[in-house]
């Protein structure tokens, strides 16, 4: 459970809108906009962690709702160590969503915040809460940055020398572009979803009265957060989040000691086949991810090269071109996204 109950639910006179003066009513849509942005951010964090975790599973039957595969992994490790820097509303919501939807175990989540005493509900669930950004960076495989923009430079200074090459920094800090993050961290495994909001009729009412976690247990709401497509809420991720997630998954496969052939077998097993298409034309191949010039040097036994996630978000890639012309893949990834929200 989220641990926080809205005692004012159903009491109109105690709702936020009731205390707003008429001259400020035009600003009320900003509240709904904030809710929708947070809903989408949490949903995409869940999908991303599910995808990475699926690349760390030893075999079927481990509680992962994604389609099962049985490729033995070198490290034989199923855990994904996730950290959150920033104990404000967004950081807390991400932690609760990861736990309540069964994505990450509480003991595999750490939060660094200046006031860990305010996170008692998460600590009671088993989340380690402290104020030590450097130690958190050393421990983590994924770090969600949920701090204020003004705090970012000092935080980056604290963590950049402690980041492992494979650690993915996932930034939800507004107003700080990817190029600036790369400069501050001297790191290439960075993801920064770039959200565009387009107000539409009825967009601000949907799911607003429920918690983020409750919304993400509702399939109709989950569908509204689908990546890369304008839905009725008017949210779109602009910077190739789908492509970046897949390249991050390939990096995780390489970290696990999988060859390129094994990595593709894993991803093909994850992506649902939703239509009766020719099997050969509906499978990922090396050409979907690397250039034709590199194919000749890539054997089935060798791993994929290590992909720079910053470059993937800023330039056209073989996968972005392949995705654009492959209806089966877009449909399959949509189904894979929805599968991330099915609790074990």
Swiss-Prot record:
Enzyme Commission number(s): 1.-.-.-
Originating organism: Xenopus tropicalis
Encoding gene per record: noxred1
Q: What does this protein do?
A: Probable oxidoreductase.
A Pfam family for this UniProt protein?
F420_oxidored
Would the keyword Oxidoreductase be found if you checked this record's keyword annotation?
A: yes
Is Oxidoreductase found in the keyword set? yes
Name of the protein this chain belongs to: NADP-dependent oxidoreductase domain-containing protein 1
Enumerate the InterPro entries for this protein. Answer: NAD(P)-bd_dom_sf (IPR036291), P5C_Rdtase_cat_N (IPR028939)
Similarity comment text for this entry: Belongs to the pyrroline-5-carboxylate reductase family.
Q: Which UniProt keywords apply?
A: Oxidoreductase
Q: Which GO terms describe its molecular function?
A: oxidoreductase activity
């Amino acid at each position: 459970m989220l641990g926080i109950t809205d005692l004012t639910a159903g009491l109109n006179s105690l709702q936020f809108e009731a205390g707003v003066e008429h001259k400020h009513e035009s600003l009320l849509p900003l509240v709904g906009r904030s809710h929708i942005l947070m809903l989408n951010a949490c949903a995409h964090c869940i999908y991303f962690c599910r995808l990475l975790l699926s690349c760390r599973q030893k075999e079927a039957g481990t509680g992962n709702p994604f389609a099962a595969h049985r490729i033995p992994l070198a490290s034989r490790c199923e855990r994904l160590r996730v950290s959150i820097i920033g104990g404000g509303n967004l950081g807390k919501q991400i932690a609760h969503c990861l736990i309540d939807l069964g994505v990450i175990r509480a003991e595999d989540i750490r939060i660094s915040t200046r006031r860990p005493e305010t996170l008692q509900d998460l600590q009671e669930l088993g989340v380690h809460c402290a104020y030590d950004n450097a130690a958190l960076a050393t421990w983590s495989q994924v770090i969600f940055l949920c701090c204020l923009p003004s705090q970012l430079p000092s935080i980056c200074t604290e963590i950049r020398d402690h980041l492992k090459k494979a650690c993915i920094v996932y930034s939800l800090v507004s107003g700080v572009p990817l190029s600036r993050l790369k400069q501050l961290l001297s790191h290439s495994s960075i993801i920064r979803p770039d959200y565009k909001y387009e107000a539409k009729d009825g967009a601000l009412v949907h799911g607003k009265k429920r918690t983020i976690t409750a919304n993400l247990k509702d399939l109709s709401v989950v569908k509204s957060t689908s990546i890369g497509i304008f839905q009725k809420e008017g949210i779109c991720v602009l910077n190739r989040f789908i492509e970046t997630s897949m390249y991050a998954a390939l990096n995780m496969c390489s970290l696990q000691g999988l060859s390129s052939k094994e990595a593709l077998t894993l991803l093909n097993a994850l992506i649902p086949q939703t239509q009766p298409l020719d099997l050969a034309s509906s499978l990922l191949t090396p050409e979907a991810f690397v250039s034709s010039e590199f194919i000749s040097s890539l054997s089935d036994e060798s791993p994929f090269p290590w992909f720079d996630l910053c470059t993937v978000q800023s330039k056209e890639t073989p996968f972005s071109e392949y995705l654009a012309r492959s209806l089966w893949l877009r449909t399959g990834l949509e189904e894979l996204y929805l599968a991330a929200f099915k609790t074990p």
